Amino acid sequence: MLQPKRTKFRKQMTGHNRGLAQRGSKVSFGEFALKSVARGRLTARQIESARRALTRHVKRGGKIWIRVFPDKPVTKKPLEVRMGKGKGGVEYWVAQIQPGKVLYEIEGVSEELAREAFALAAAKLPLATTFVKRTVM
């Protein structure tokens, strides 16, 4: 599972997930990419699950890049605990996703295979996504 090796602070405030993705919105490494068209959070488990679906479908062919990293801790208090007494412990890690963010990239496979693989990966994610190709300039 993806998570930071160490952080400056153990816990973070919830914050807001506003705006559009400025950084990480272009296909930089591969030929084809899976791009988010919705706003939300991806947990480390969801990112890994989609990665496995991608890898299994392309069967060692091509190269895959994961363009998101879960760097935000989400805390949770234990069940049946009264309110107060401080913030709960870190339960899992999430990546905050804005519309336009490239999630995964792939190269070395045909477009048809890439579309099928990304469709399988997208089924594992809680966000609406779209298939994009690299534009040569």
Curated annotation (Swiss-Prot):
GO BP annotations of the record are: translation
> InterPro entries under this entry?
Ribosomal_uL16, Ribosomal_uL16_bact-type, Ribosomal_uL16_CS, Ribosomal_uL16_dom, Ribosomal_uL16_sf
Q: Which CDD domains match?
A: Ribosomal_L16_L10e
Concerning PROSITE patterns, the annotation shows:
RIBOSOMAL_L16_1, RIBOSOMAL_L16_2
Gene3D superfamilies hit by this protein? Ribosomal protein L10e/L16
Q: Which UniProt keywords apply?
A: Ribonucleoprotein, Ribosomal protein, RNA-binding, rRNA-binding, tRNA-binding
Query: What family is this protein classified in?
Result: Belongs to the universal ribosomal protein uL16 family.
Q: What task does this protein carry out? A: Binds 23S rRNA and is also seen to make contacts with the A and possibly P site tRNAs.
Name of the featured protein: Large ribosomal subunit protein uL16
- Naturally occurring in which organism (per UniProt): Ectopseudomonas mendocina (strain ymp)
The gene name reads rplP
